[in-house]
């Protein structure tokens, strides 16, 4: 798994050494990594990292707590889901960044705004995947439960919920990544004083490219770690999927 990053850093180093890109625009990878490690080991970068992480987790938790149960309930009644499917698909297809002015009007320039717009974008992903997980549950297992005399409630809690776990986890994994993306975009453009997004755009404006690239690497590392965490959780909790 380290081969890809190693190749990337070698290419990056060669580009800098042969001055294919001016050093003022692209510092060496080793200088960037040094800035990253110093900043994360007690520098101001660690504080901005923490702000972005907290906002991302807040947005994700709101999306998960609301999206999973609502998605499962809608999925258990396909007619109810079809009645709101257009609205869900419409907003799911709308770039969340296009909704920033709307959220600015509602919440103003505040941390709540950043969390709210990220939670909204992530919520639609969770809701969609949870609902479709229930709708597309294996018909054989549902029929087997009916044959054994299970009630609708028993089928819902013992079959449909478990059948929806894998697509729900796929939705959660996508949602946490979406939360991070939207939070960073919001930090860039919604009057933020702290956070990786603010740090990236601020560094770019003053041509502090080492700090800019270090912040980008920190954001990428955060997204990668969050994705790996959910992959591990999915494998442990839904290990029986497909059997």
Go through each PLM region and give its residues.
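Loop-to-helix entry region at the N-terminal start of transmembrane alpha-helices
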Residues: 47-55, 105-126, 164, 169, ...
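Short cytoplasmic-facing helical segments at TM-TM junctions of multi-pass membrane proteins
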Residues: 129-168, 200
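Cytoplasmic-entry segments and transmembrane alpha-helices of multi-pass inner-membrane transporters
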Residues: 69-104, 118, 129-132, 143
């Amino acid at each position: 798994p380290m081969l890809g990053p190693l190749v990337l850093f070698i290419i990056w180093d060669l580009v800098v050494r042969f001055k294919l890109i001016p050093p003022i625009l692209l510092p060496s990878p080793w200088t960037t990594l040094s800035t990253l490690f110093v900043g994360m080991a007690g520098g101001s970068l660690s504080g901005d990292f923490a702000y972005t992480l907290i906002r991302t987790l807040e947005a994700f938790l709101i999306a998960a707590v609301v999206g999973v149960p609502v998605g499962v309930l809608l999925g258990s009644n396909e007619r109810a889901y079809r009645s709101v499917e257009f609205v869900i698909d419409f907003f799911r297809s709308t770039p969340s960044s296009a909704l920033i002015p709307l959220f600015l009007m509602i919440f103003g320039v505040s941390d709540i705004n950043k969390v709210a717009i990220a939670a909204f974008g992530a919520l639609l992903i969770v809701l969609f995947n949870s609902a479709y997980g229930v709708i597309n549950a294996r018909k054989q297992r549902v029929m087997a439960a009916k044959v054994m005399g299970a009630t609708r409630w028993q089928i819902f809690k013992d079959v449909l919920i478990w059948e929806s776990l894998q697509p729900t986890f796929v939705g959660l994994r996508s949602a946490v990544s979406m939360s991070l993306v939207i939070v960073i975009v919001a930090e860039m453009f919604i009057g933020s004083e702290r956070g990786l997004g603010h740090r990236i755009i601020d560094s770019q404006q003053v041509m502090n490219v080492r700090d800019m690239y270090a912040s980008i690497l920190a954001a990428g590392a955060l997204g990668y770690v969050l994705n790996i965490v959910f992959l591990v959780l999915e494998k442990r909790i839904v290990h029986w999927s497909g059997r």
